[in-house]
Amino acid sequence: MKKLIMVLLVVISGIAKAQTSYKIGDIATDFNLKNVDNKMISMANYKEAKGFFVIFHCNQCPYSKAYENRIIALNAKYASKGLPVITINPNDPAINPEDSFEKMKIRAKQEKYTFPYLVDDTQEIAKAYGAKATPHVYLLKKTDEGLVVSYTGAIDNDTENVNDAKIKYAENAADALLAGKEIELAQTKAIGCSIKWKKTAQ
């Protein structure tokens, strides 16, 4: 009987965790995370923003590296329109030391990041958002009710950045959001490396 109860508790716990993944239309939580300049960053700091690209990103994943310039380009194109990029590294550096906070600082300086690169050292934000991979994009729209999840998934459909005819999912969603139109494709699959969870955080 005790074993059955334990199994049920594990199943219920798993369901509860699965329910924390954001869906389109959900209100996303804000955060207060440390940036590579050692300052704490919250979306509440951006008083004039219309929304945000929140992108789970890291140092060591080949997919994150492949998309790095495109993430920089997203910020260059949309920050001035009220949709700045905020990147968050959720990985456990105990699994891969390349994702340590010190290495994050080096990477951001080396690649000339123009946006915050935050460390989610407790992994609570990644779990709350339901992030699956790096990179994983969440486009949030600022409303009176809160930050509404308007798009989630991949940046585009070209992981190797070799196809001029790529479908720019994140840009298309942002353009629709800014124009006050419905986002035709609001969810895609995030293609990247799995997040390196702490053993106690899985």
Question: Which residues are covered by each model-predicted region?
Answer:
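Loop/turn elements at helix/coil->beta-strand transitions in domains of secreted/extracellular proteins
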Residues: A49-G51, S80-V85, K112-P116, T134
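Bacterial Sec-dependent N-terminal signal peptides
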Residues: M1-S21
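Short active-site neighborhood of thiol/selenol oxidoreductases, capturing the structured segment around
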Residues: S42-K65, A174
